[in-house]
């Protein structure tokens, strides 16, 4: 954690302070909240899944780090549970200066008044982790507005570009955690296929996948898509409540989240256990693009080219089978990007102008969607960029026609 914090310091000007907020649970009703989702940049620096917290970095004559965390009263613990104490947080984060969040406002006032000269000297620059300012309900956005109003002389900078650079390259520990999430996803798909053999309801397949996640103390990485027949032509179909027709294809786009890191896998299954000839033709087309683009990935290649080359491959193969008449027609049947970075976020932040580098984790997810035939096919894998090429982290999850049909035997 300290190495990551040091990289934030390295990106900061002298006489500056940076704030990274953990976020808070959003109210659902008078006495309920939606599940808390920690700010992944805060987690990246602290490894804490803790609400209402603030990491503060001050760069002046020396570099100071302090972490403000909530402290619950005994009465509140009876309702909401026990939070980690300062000693436990110190052990987890390797940070020594842990403070009660209740003191943050007074601390903040002291930074930008005459008292600052005695402690830190004049501070001229403020760095904020505010990537989406339109979400004005978030504490950090409100905080940003107050700073601009009360201290207009300050130079305010965004940290988002720094986190993009840092989080794009995964450490060995991060890669291992992503592998764990993929393995749980694989187990969930195995159970889902067994369920599909006897139950032709989308919601039953979803339930079987959720069971495996809960069994492994994992969460859904995103809203699971179980889309059969014509629903598979809708990219973000999440109703998962229709009957699955005989000889339909079932597109399953899903993933487990383990210790905040995500898997993102898509497999497409024949509801009867056997592909029809037309389904085989289209499925093989998508599979070949998936496989060829995984082979295409190497350090030094452009992420923009990755998307464009994949689209061109789809068009070439669609032309050969007569699905389209011109390469431009592919947009009628393929209308999303070929992939994205994966990590703490399912769509991990990145600089799209960066070339591929060792340690990046990408998805490769070509698809074909033919509304008039009620067919949607997508095949998605999670790929690690190595020093010489790539490794398919989800290779163990069956995806060839023979391998998928064997699952039903």
Give a label for each model feature:
Residues 1-409:
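Active-site neighborhoods and metal-handling regions in enzymes and metal-associated proteins
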